[in-house]
Structure formats: C-alpha cells, structure tokens
C-alpha cells in the first residue's frame, strides 16, 4: 500500500509541475484559452481523447459493463462517434471561425441575446460535468485507499484547480498528454488483461455470466437511442470539445487527429465494458455497482500496479474536470461577463485566472453536495443537447434560421427538458426526446415566420 501512495504522490506532484511549466508558456489570452492555436496532431489527439474520457466514461462504463456486459460500451462509443463526425464534417467551418466559445457562433449568426442565453446553458453544462468528474475522484480514492470522500474531493479537485488556474490551456494540454499515456497503459495494458485473466478468460466469462452479456443490444435499444441523443449530439456542441478544436494549428490536424481520438474513445469504451464484465465474475454481489472499477482494482492487482491503475482512473477524471472547468470559465468570461455584465472589459490572463478560480470553488462545493454521478451528467447533457443542439447546428447548416427562432428554440428545449425531468425522473429517457422535439419544432416554426439571419463568416487569422 505504501508503494501505491508513493505513486499517487508522484502523480500529483507531476500534475502540479506541468501546471507550473504551462504557466510559463501562457503569455497571452490566446495562449491561456486555446494554447495559442498551435497544437500539432500528437498533442491534439491526446488532449481531445483525454477531455472526452472522464469519470463517467471510465467508472461509469465499468459500472455499465458490470450490469449489462459488453453493451455497456455504448455511452463512450457515442462520444467517440460524435468526435469523429465533428472532426470530419464540421471541422473546417469551426476552425475558420477563430472564436473562443461555441456560443459566440450564436451571436455571429443570430443576435447578442442568443449568446447570453446559450452561454448560461453552456456554463451550467460544463460546470456539472466538472462536478461529476470531481465526485468520481472522491469515489475512487475512498474505495481503494479508504480516504474519506470529502477530503479526497478537496485534495484532488484542488490540484485540478491549481494547474488550471496558473497555466490555462497550456497546462491542460501538457497534463492531458501525461494523463492520456497513463490511462492507456493502465486500462489497456494492465487492468484489462489482468481482469480477464483473473475471471478465467473470455470463454469462462461467457459460460458464467448471465445470458446476453456479450450481446451488444443487451442494454436495450431505448437506452442506446438515449445515449445517441445525449452523448453523440453532446459531443458535437460541447464547449469543452470545441475549445480543443480551437487549439489545433490547422484544419488537417483537426480532421485526422480528431478521427484518431474518436476511434480511441470507442476502443476505450469496449475495454472498460469488458473490465466491468470481468468484475461481475469475480465480485458478483457488489452492493454498489459504481464501485466496480475500484473493487476489481483491489481484487486483481498487486501493490504498485494498483497505484498505476488508480492513477489511470484519476487521469481520466482530472482531464475532464480541468477541461470542463476551463470551458465553463471561458464561457462565463467571454460570453457573459465581458460581453454583457461589464461590456468593454479587456480580457486578460489575470481576469481569466480569477474567473477560473471562482468556477473551481463552485465545482468543489457542488461536488461535496452531490452524490449521483450519472444523474448529474444526465442533467448536464439533457440541458446542453435539448437547449443548444438545434440552434447551433442550424447556425452552421440552415440559411433560413432566424434570431427569433434560435432564442425560442433554446427556451422551449430547456423548459421541456426540465419539465420532463421533474415529471419522469432525472434518468428517464423522455427529457432529451421531448426537449429535442420542442426545440426543433419551435426553431423551424419561428424561423419560417421571421426574417433569416446573415450567414456565418470566417474570421481573419
């Protein structure tokens, strides 16, 4: 156990050290928010995959694998598919906009009020995703090391806040690459093979596990559809994802490195689902399936390897927490504070650091108060997709879209999502379905009844 603690200490110090190094590279606002738009294919692939694959993708997919077998991969598969489509279909338009936030696109195409409303929704989304990741830090360390949940959240979340505040996107890029390597080794080369071997191999797993555990449809077509609506479309419009696109040095990097990141995500989902299925063989009576990742780590790994695999989980979690923290802070600063609350304010690194720190404190407070990771993630994606998908995609693809249609669409989609969550529960499939239908119907009807907006314009270098 001492060796595991030493590994975790080295990991934490490395993250802080990379954050300090990133601070030295962040000389301008562009450096802090989008790494100067200078990332090549290697750095871009690693940082894109790292921000997508967080606590829900790792711990949540192992949990789904424990409950449903291989079909637990669908959540992460849809995220990967969204990254692929975003990279191949929309990358050229997005890269040429030369903006910092998704919701700046709403103002460019529609009007200022759509940027404000969209910004509020986007801040709520990114903050909630950061909260789910921070909660997962506490869950993993509590189960594996016996550290109480709240101190673990404060310690792990505090590290995320420090390196995010001091170095911005450059710190996130450097830490993401190390985290990408750690979780690749920890998941694919250590935990996956040792879990399957501990369960007696794939053949024995097929014999022992309930029927359907190796059927890709076992989780249910309705759940697969919900994952498609939430996570595929969520990947298309999330600020945390777009902000990584803005870091690339060229459209070619976005296209091909993004394709690689999407494929990596799909393979990662399959690996985590198989780990969960192996945990079901070895630990069939877990009272809390969400602890499957931590429990199988304790069950099959020796000291040292256990520390590496816990570091892999924390790498996945912290990369998403930091990415969404910076995304929420960027939208709050660019789309709300500097644009509406204090118009004319000159954005600089000091302001960015203060707002990032403010959002980090909010992240820690909420993480200490909220317990259910999947519920919090569902709220975030329901609001994001139900409220913003239609007007953002419409801004890119539909010339007839109007400002009034965009605003009405955001409001109608969010209200429908909130009403359905209140009526049917946070984990129900209905909120995203009715939210999208309300958003789309309102967008089309109001746009056709009003004057269309001007087309988007590429911005100068």
Enumerate the predicted regions with their spans.
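Membrane-embedded helix-loop-helix hairpins and adjacent transmembrane boundary segments
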Residues: 1-461
């Amino acid at each position: 156990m001492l060796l595991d603690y030493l590994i975790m200490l080295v990991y934490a110090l490395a993250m802080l050290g990379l954050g300090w190094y990133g601070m030295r590279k962040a000389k301008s606002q562009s450096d802090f928010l989008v790494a100067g738009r200078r990332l090549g294919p290697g750095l871009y692939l690693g940082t894109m995959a790292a921000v997508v694959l967080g606590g829900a993708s790792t711990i949540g997919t192992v949990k789904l694998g424990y409950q449903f077998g291989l079909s637990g991969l669908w959540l992460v598969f849809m995220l990967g598919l969204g990254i692929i489509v975003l990279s191949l279909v929309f990358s050229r338009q997005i890269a040429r906009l030369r903006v910092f936030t998704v919701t700046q696109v709403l103002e460019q195409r529609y009007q200022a009020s759509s940027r404000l409303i969209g910004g509020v929704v986007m801040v709520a989304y990114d903050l909630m995703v950061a909260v789910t990741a921070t909660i997962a830090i506490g869950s993993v360390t509590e189960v594996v090391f016996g550290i109480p949940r709240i101190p673990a959240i404060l310690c792990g979340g505090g590290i995320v806040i420090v390196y995010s505040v001091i170095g911005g996107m450059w710190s996130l890029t450097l830490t993401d690459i190390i985290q990408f390597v750690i979780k690749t080794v920890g998941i694919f080369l250590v935990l996956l093979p040792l879990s399957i071997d501990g369960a007696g191999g794939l053949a024995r797993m097929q014999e022992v596990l309930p029927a359907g555990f190796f059927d890709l449809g076992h989780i249910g077509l309705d759940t697969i559809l919900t994952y498609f609506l939430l996570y595929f479309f969520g990947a298309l419009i999330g600020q945390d994802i777009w902000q990584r696109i803005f870091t690339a040095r060229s459209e070619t990097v976005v296209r091909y490195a993004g394709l690689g990141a999407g494929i990596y995500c799909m393979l990662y989902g399959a690996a985590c689902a198989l780990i969960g299925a192996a945990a079901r063989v070895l630990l069939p009576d877990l009272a809390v399936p969400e602890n499957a990742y931590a429990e199988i780590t304790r069950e099959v790994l020796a000291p040292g390897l256990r520390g590496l695999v816990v570091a892999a989980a924390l790498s996945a979690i912290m990369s998403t927490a930091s990415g969404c923290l910076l995304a929420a802070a960027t939208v709050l600063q660019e789309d709300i504070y500097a644009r509406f609350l204090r118009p004319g304010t000159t954005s600089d690194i000091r302001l960015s650091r203060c707002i990032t720190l403010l959002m980090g404190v909010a992240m820690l407070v909420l993480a200490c108060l909220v317990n259910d990771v999947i519920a919090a993630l569902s709220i975030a994606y329901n609001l994001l997709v139900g409220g913003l998908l239609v007007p953002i995609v419409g801004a890119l693809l539909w010339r007839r879209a109007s400002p009034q249609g965009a605003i009405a669409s955001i409001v109608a989609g969010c209200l429908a999502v909130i009403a359905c969550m209140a009526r049917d529960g946070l984990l129900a499939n209905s909120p995203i379905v009715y939210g999208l239908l309300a958003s789309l119907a309102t967008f089309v009807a109001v746009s056709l009844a009003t004057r269309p907006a001007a087309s988007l314009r590429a911005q100068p270098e």
